[in-house]
Swiss-Prot record:
The gene is PTGES2. Belongs to the GST superfamily. Residues 75-377 are cytoplasmic. Residues 90-193 form the Glutaredoxin domain. This is Prostaglandin E synthase 2.
Amino acid sequence: MAPATRVVRALWTGGCALAWRLGGRPQPLLPTQSRAGFAGAAGGQGPVAAARKGSPRLLGAAALALGGALGLYHTARWHLHAQDLHAERSAVQLSLSSRLQLTLYQYKTCPFCSKVRAFLDFHALPYQVVEVNPVLRAEIKFSSYRKVPILVAQEGESSQQLNDSSVIISALKTYLVSGQPLEEIITYYPAMKAVNDQGKEVTEFGNKYWLMLNEKEAQQVYSGKEARTEEMKWRQWADDWLVHLISPNVYRTPTEALASFDYIVREGKFGAVEGAVAKYMGAAAMYLISKRLKSRHRLQDNVREDLYEAADKWVAAVGKDRPFMGGQKPNLADLAVYGVLRVMEGLDAFDDLMQHTHIQPWYLRVERAITEASPAH
């Protein structure tokens, strides 16, 4: 297949895998793998709701119901096991972060990858970065899960693959607070297949915004139940709404689309021919796709207005009495929103956002907090 054809095919079928993983068609669903993602600590198949003939809506509802039951099962199992874990822990532990060797497979300009980097940097977790070629994706040929980010965590003799940005963050935060083995933690976030209302197969992960902590551990992280609920709500908002405003804004005009792909090519891992093709053909394709996304998500004629409204809604939720939603330091919602917005830096959409909303002071505070905490990696 010619390089030009491969690039165009990646642009269309991969959509936002090449850019901000938001354009074009949804990523094709790939089989759940053993020991990779959340198929179970023993390496067996994870819980799967198989697609069957019939109503897509009913299939989706049935799969989600099964997922809820599985989530309750895993949560209950965790509650029983947590007491034993707590009793076994030494009063003086080795630094948990030093026991992990982390490798992040990413596209630098992907907002989901940016979320994970923001989390890792703020929590001073050293990690290696492998930039994935968005056309060939040879760097992740070891994985049947073909989206990024993928995080491989080596803990002693145990190696775990974590998929989905929100699951990666929740699992690692649980690990840092509780000290539970990562191999055990990832079983609390089971992968589930379902069919959505459009008849497309999708993979979801149970409990992905929830930290698996006992009551004492939760009190170390949250000031109360309301703070925990608030964090979960806004983490999901970042994934379900904010992230979908990026592509329509950065590809809003032909000029902006070209500038965006110039940045993607410079920051990404492209060959010379692939980069040249991606810059011009990718910009043209994503400009057209951005119009479809505008319609799909029912955005205003001027998509900037939706971006501005989202930013000001977030600022209002943080409020005037605390520097971050997490209080005196960023919580997981702060890091998620920051990570999504950061991918627009250097583009007109980002400059307009800073100029026309009240988000800049908060954004700079998070940036400073991450910079001060971040190790060299």
